[in-house]
Amino acid sequence: MSNWLLVVYRDWLVHIVHRLKLELLKQRYLHIDETHVQVLKEPGRKNTSDSYMWVYCSIRDAVNPIRYFEYQPGRSGKYPEAFLREYEGYIHTDAYSGYNAVSGVKRCLCYTHLRRAFVDALPKDIHNSEASKPAEAILRLNQLFNIESELETLPPDQKKKERLIREKPLLEAFWSWAEKSAIGELPKSKLSKAFHYALNNREGFWNYLEDGNCSISNSLAENCIRPFVIGRKNWLFSGSPKGAEASAGIYTLVETAKANGLAPMKYIKYILSDMPGSAFLEHPEYLDDYLPWNPLVKEFCR
């Protein structure tokens, strides 16, 4: 079965996956996340080494949503830098420093991660006096999320205006409070780390205010990569780098099909039934006939 999948991916599916990457890089807003994966037979590496599966996603309201998975042997910033070398736009990420290697983009950092840092800083006894600061941080950030829920259905331009009126003052107050509250905290405590997470990445947390299409959370990328994480618990590892590449490509097709309202099995069956008769190698534009938003594909694969 695995050898058959490798051949099918190499001969047919890979061409659609590459086409989806080109389409994704035309989009101005992306969500990015990564998770570890074990890959055997990597040159010069032990089988127990951690490799990574990266996911690059369209925003929620994208006309043509794409979920692109890419296997790489590491987590270094050189991998997103290479993927996004010609890209200009906004990327939603966590505060991992590896993304600093990506030039020509604006990073929108994830408030869900920031709130989680303060939740982790809460003592087990919430009545403990040490709970007051993390609890206040959580309440302040919850105000932001509550407003975002109210603005969810607004068009981008109007959402931007409302954010500047309603959210910007809250952010200014939060960072002013954080600067004062961080003073005197034990350097290695969870609360001190949460404050530093906020204060050291302030610019990235503010960037979403520039454009109403941007989000305050990178949860979309986490949700996109979750099917891979769940699958990993069952199949445990990839048998080779080629297998990991094929796995990334097939996850790309399956999750992109789902994002476009298609039945993944029908979609892949449609590709493999029709593509062998296509002259796509001589005419690469024919690959557009197999993209998940093509009207004929939507007709047969829902």
Where are these regions (language model features)?
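Catalytic center-proximal scaffold of phosphoryl-transfer enzymes
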Residues: 1-302
